Swiss-Prot record:
Taxonomic lineage of the native organism: Eukaryota, Fungi, Dikarya, Ascomycota, Pezizomycotina
One of the record's GO molecular function terms: chitin binding
Protein name (Swiss-Prot/TrEMBL): Secreted LysM effector Lys1
SUPFAM superfamilies documented for this protein: LysM domain (SSF54106)
Function text: Might have a role in sequestration of chitin oligosaccharides (breakdown products of fungal cell walls that are released during invasion and act as triggers of host immunity) to dampen host defense.
Organism of derivation: Pochonia chlamydosporia (strain 123)
Length: 123
């Protein structure tokens, strides 16, 4: 059984999560496909961080080594493989590996939870 102090602490932490997470509706249900804030920051910003890299802004984070002329990006989820990402974006595996050399020639070093390049502009 939890003591009163622990119960109050847990309640205050849960309230902070609900306040900082606008994807929780009035019935305290999470809206699907939206991130949940578990530790609020000083600035709550919904924009995806980007960096200017060539002709377009590149969303962050990315795996090191991505080509500079990338103009189309795909979020790599845990469990994704290079071939799967390439096929879903209608590009060849060879192009995917050329544009994302950090994934390795055998795709063993593809990072999850990063953006990968799935399209390039002509240099």
């Amino acid at each position: 059984m939890m003591g009163l102090a622990k119960t109050l602490l847990l309640a205050s932490q849960l309230t902070a999560v609900v306040v900082a997470t606008p994807t929780i509706n009035n019935d305290n249900e999470l809206t699907t496909k939206w991130p949940v804030c578990v530790k609020p920051t000083k600035v709550l910003d919904e924009r995806i961080p980007t960096v200017k890299r060539g002709p377009v802004e590149t969303p962050l984070p990315t795996q090191p080594g991505m080509v500079n002329n990338c103009n189309k990006f795909c979020w790599v989820q845990a469990g994704n493989k290079c071939y799967q990402v390439a096929m879903e974006n209608h590009i060849s595996l060879a192009d995917f590996l050329k544009w994302n050399p950090g994934a390795g020639s055998d795709c063993r070093t593809l990072w999850a939870n990063t953006y990968a390049c799935v399209g390039v502009s002509k240099k």
